[in-house]
Amino acid sequence: KDKGPPPKSRYEEELRTRGKTTITAANFIDVIITRQIASDKDARERGSQSSDSSSSLSSHRYEAPSDAIEVISPASSPAPPQEKPQTYQPEMVKANQAENESPQQYEGPLTHYRSQQGSPSPQQQPPLPPSSQAEGMGQVPRTHRLITLADHICQIITQDFARNQVPSQPSTSTFQTSPSALSSTPVRTKPSSRYSPESQSQTVLHPRPGPRVSPENLVDKSRGSRPGKSPERSHIPSEPYEPISPPQGPAVHEKQDSMLLLSQRGMDPAEQRSDSRSPGSISYLPYFFTKLESTSPMVKSKKQEIFRKLNSSGGGDSDMAAAQPGTEIFNLPAVTTSGAVSSRSHSFADPASNLGLEDIIRKALMGSFDDKVEDHGVVMPHPVGVVPGSASTSVVTSSETRRDEGDPSPHSGVCKPKLINKSNSRKSKSPIPGQNYLGTERPSSVSSVHSEGDYHRQTPGWAWEDRPSSTGSTQFPYNPLTIRMLSSTPPTPIACAPSAITQAAPHQQSRIWEREPAPLLSAQYETLSDSDD
């Protein structure tokens, strides 16, 4: 409890005291994260213990009104939930005391909070004795699980952990318990039904992860402990958390947050999870992409191709895949994400077409970008104006070619601008993803969000060198060469290109930076998109 409450109670106290989720979202998130982390720690420490004890205890909690009560307050006061594993494990009594304390200490604020929540104030109001609270909880909190937004978010994160991490037995057992707890506390089940979408979904999600986990839950056990904690929270929350606060809103954001957290914090778990999931792609966030990978032969083949190339070319992929499982799609293929699916699907089937498309695209992207890069970096001496000129020249030629190509494959034409924007932004990004994020075009490729900084930083070298190789190593030299010739930049930079690109990356980056909004990029994109359209 000490662990959890201090940060939690700090914010959650505020929440409860204020009775409003006046706490800033940052604080919520902080609370959630802290709680999650603390719970993760606790869970890791207690892990199986807490999951086991929490499972049994959860039953106890639910069975014991006091416990249930604590559950109530914990619902609003995550501290007790964390505490529960601790407290319960150390002593149910302490937990009960804590329950009494927490319900009361939070009860006042909670009552405030609850009443604000508009929960049946009568039951809220009385800092009922734990049992009475349990009753009250059964009554009031059930309806609105006094779930603080933080708790709700935490629940969501927990949920996501459980779901994404495919948590661990804890979640499974927890949820088994939770069902039992639900059975033991059918009343809660009602609230669950009331909030059923979420609580049930949580329960369902967890059980679902549970089975999924089972093979891995041993592995996840520690990690799972995190979910274990989460599951405790989850089962507690799952029932207590009938988030009064609209689950969807926070849930979504939190899920995203939790996803991000997962992607960040879960990098390891993600990779670990990846064992349960498709290795490269943990669907932590881009489940869609994972799905896409599994479903889309193009993506699949591309990924394989990329993996092979990257593996052969060396660590780029390992970093990439390891770094962000779901993002290979973004980072690796120059263009797999946007309309590429349609246009490149045939491209995949048809290497020649692929060459054509990607050749053109690379001419445009690689060429113009390389011109940017190499003109910026290698040809830095050239006036900036020259760079735009040369880049635009290459762009024009490539865009014209693209138009020609576009005529053959309208998709490709249309998609290309996107792809180009994407790839360009991606590439320009890659050297300095951080800055590029600042870049206006950053948005153009959402992928950047997932495949962020590190990955890109790694990418630049192979992004240009190897990525072309995805369509054919020749293209890279070819494109830059031709484009460079087009842009009348000495072909020699080609040799320098990779190093120049990587080395120049910072410089070019800054330049590209300066230029990104500038006509060079914007104009090119405008032109390309317009001409293609």
UniProtKB/Swiss-Prot annotation:
UniProt motif CORNR box 2: location: 153-157
Biased composition (Polar residues): 181-204
PTM annotation, UniProt: Ubiquitinated; mediated by SIAH2 and leading to its subsequent proteasomal degradation.
Residue positions of motif CORNR box 3: 357-361
Keyword check for Disulfide bond: no
Basic and acidic residues: bias regions: 1-17, 38-47, 218-236
The UniProt record lists the keyword ATP-binding: no
Superkingdom of origin organism: Eukaryota
Motif (CORNR box 1): 29-33
Gene Ontology cellular-component terms listed: chromatin; cytoplasm; histone deacetylase complex; mitotic spindle; nucleus; perinuclear region of cytoplasm; transcription regulator complex; transcription repressor complex
Phosphothreonine PTM sites in chain numbering: T492
Gene Ontology molecular functions: chromatin binding; DNA binding; histone deacetylase binding; histone deacetylase regulator activity; nuclear estrogen receptor binding; nuclear receptor binding; nuclear retinoic acid receptor binding; nuclear retinoid X receptor binding
UniProt region (ID1), positions on chain: 130-209
Main location: nucleus
Region (ID2): 306-367
Chain positions covered by the region annotation Disordered: 1-21, 37-144, 165-254, 382-476
Function of the protein: Mediates transcriptional repression by certain nuclear receptors. Part of a complex which promotes histone deacetylation and the formation of repressive chromatin structures which may impede the access of basal transcription factors. Participates in the transcriptional repressor activity produced by BCL6. Recruited by ZBTB7A to the androgen response elements/ARE on target genes, negatively regulates androgen receptor signaling and androgen-induced cell proliferation. Mediates the NR1D1-dependent repression and circadian regulation of TSHB expression.
Family, per entry: Belongs to the N-CoR nuclear receptor corepressors family.
Stated name of the protein: Nuclear receptor corepressor 1
Species annotation: Rattus norvegicus
Classification lineage: Eukaryota, Metazoa, Chordata, Craniata, Vertebrata
Gene name of this polypeptide: Ncor1
